[in-house]
Amino acid sequence: GYYDAYYNKANAVRRGITKDFTDAFTKCDVIVTPTTAGPAFKLGAKTSDPVAMYLEDIFTVSSNHTGMPAMSIPSGTVNEEGVQLPLGIQLIAPHMGEARLFVVGKKFLGEE
């Protein structure tokens, strides 16, 4: 039925994304993205627009779909209306690449 058709399509898309990421890791050690589309927003600020709220997490979706390890680390702040708001970057590694994430994350943070 409809459930099977959507489920099978979703799995095909997931496999395609996983293949693209796996191919990318033949050319790089980690993939770096923003953690969110913008700085942190006030609690409850986007509850009236769920799509806008979900789009803030758009960069973290790929690692969830591929099952590849990812970590977010602080990368600075930005001044929004007199308030310093945190920014972060996300590091994504290939399957079983958790140790690589810790090494790169520590280097970025100046801890190694």
Descriptions of predicted regions:
Residues 1-65:
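Serine-dependent amide/ester hydrolase catalytic core
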Residues 1-19, 27, 64-112:
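Structural helix-boundary/capping segments
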